[in-house]
Amino acid sequence: MSFKLKILTPTTGFNRTGYTTSLVRLVMYFAQNRIYPECGEQTIDYRTIEGSGISSNRELLIQEFLESDATHVLFIDEDMGFDPRTLHIVAGRRQPIVGCNYPMRVPGAGFTALAKDRKARIITNEQSYGIEPAFYTGFGFCLIERQVFEKIQRPWFLIGFNTSTRYYTTEDAAFAHMVNEAGIPWYVDHDASKGICHIGNFNYWWNETIQKPIITSESTEWEKA
């Protein structure tokens, strides 16, 4: 079998150092370790589009993805830091969509992942492990099989308006409704989520301990600020 990956990052042009360092280390780990034991071929490619229209740029990136022979797409946002093994963890679940859970970039605002019934946010804590069905996780670090985009029609990433909250929705919400209607499961990976941070004024981790990255020539280590 083959695992042909495209990493896609729609960017505003402000890629964080933590994102860049994490991406380099992920690619190095990918080059040295098989995704699956039976994988005879694995390749990796990277594409980005810079601009303020994140929703439309996601759409363009997926169009290009579908014109290739890639089997999987990995969305990574420009403000994410991650362990180099994170891709292997989510890919190892062998599910159509597996994403990571991470705190929003506001202290106390909670996690991005929304429960399947859409009544509460999913919490990742010390007791959380494995994967859990979700309505969506967000696209901060999210692996999606090619077949998902072949089963649902464009537009994939519409911006909507919630008449109850009086707020505009993000593009992942529209995508989540489409995959849910198509019967495609979306999972949050709690194990992978514990290697993810959301980079803002501070690095927001799953346990919401404010931490800062210490980058060395050999590895990335984390210490409390």
What are the residue ranges of the model-derived segments?
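Short beta-strand-to-loop acidic/aromatic patch adjacent to the donor-nucleotide binding site
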Residues: 70-81
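C-terminal catalytic/acceptor-binding lobe
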Residues: 19, 151-225
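Conserved catalytic core of nucleotide-sugar-dependent glycosyltransferases
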Residues: 62, 83-161
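N-proximal low-complexity "stem/linker" segments adjacent to membrane-targeting elements
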Residues: 1-51, 56
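Anion (oxyanion) recognition and catalysis
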Residues: 40, 91, 179-180
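Conserved donor sugar-nucleotide recognition element shared by glycan-biosynthetic enzymes
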Residues: 54-58, 120, 172
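Active-site nucleotide-sugar/metal-binding loop of Leloir-type enzymes
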Residues: 59-72
